[in-house]
A protein has these predicted regions:
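Conserved catalytic-core motifs of GNAT/GCN5-like acyltransferases
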Residues: 122-130
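Conserved acetyl-CoA binding element of GNAT-fold acetyltransferases
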Residues: 59-79, 104
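Conserved beta-strand-loop-alpha-helix junction that forms the acyl-donor binding cleft
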Residues: 94-113, 130
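Conserved beta-hairpin
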Residues: 41-54, 59
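Conserved acetyl-CoA-binding loop-helix of GNAT-fold acetyltransferases
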Residues: 71-92, 110-118
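Helix-loop element at the rim of GNAT/NAT acetyltransferase active sites that forms part
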Residues: 10-24
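A short beta-loop-alpha structural element at the N-terminal edge
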Residues: 1-11
Length: 130
């Protein structure tokens, strides 16, 4: 990724309301190092009317990471459509990876959960820290 893309991702990270993988946002250097050292299969910045509104990425477990400044059903649908039209899930590996795309959602992100349910997406798992 370019430095501009890393900066835009950092802006989104600072704007994020819900976190899954960390308790507090990383520093700009920590973020830059992470983005450079941990490439996802694909990572897209999402714009609407030339304004940055979020990012989406795919991982090797077929998970889709969606981070939008505000979650709206039409934008979620557009993300799903783009991903499905441009990418195929990796083949399943028993006990490792499904052969379908899925999304991990913070339990606090009730708006996205509601949108997914309205779109007839079904919940397959809940995770708990121990």
């Amino acid at each position: 990724p370019t430095q501009n893309q890393i900066d835009e991702l950092f802006f989104l990270l600072q704007s994020r309301k819900y976190f899954i993988s960390h308790k507090t946002p990383p520093s700009k250097k920590e973020h830059s190092d992470f983005v450079s050292e941990h490439p996802y299969l694909v990572w897209y910045l999402i714009y609407k009317n030339k304004n940055l509104i979020g990012s989406v990425y795919l991982q090797t477990d077929n998970s889709i990471g969606i981070d939008l400044i505000e979650y709206h059903e039409n934008e979620i649908l557009s993300v799903f459509k783009y991903i499905k039209n441009n990418h195929k899930p990796l083949p399943s590996i028993k006990s490792v990876r499904r052969d379908e795309f899925f999304i991990n959602v913070s339990s606090e992100n009730t708006n996205l959960i509601k949108i997914l349910k309205n779109l007839d997406k079904y919940e397959i798992q809940r995770s708990f820290l121990v």
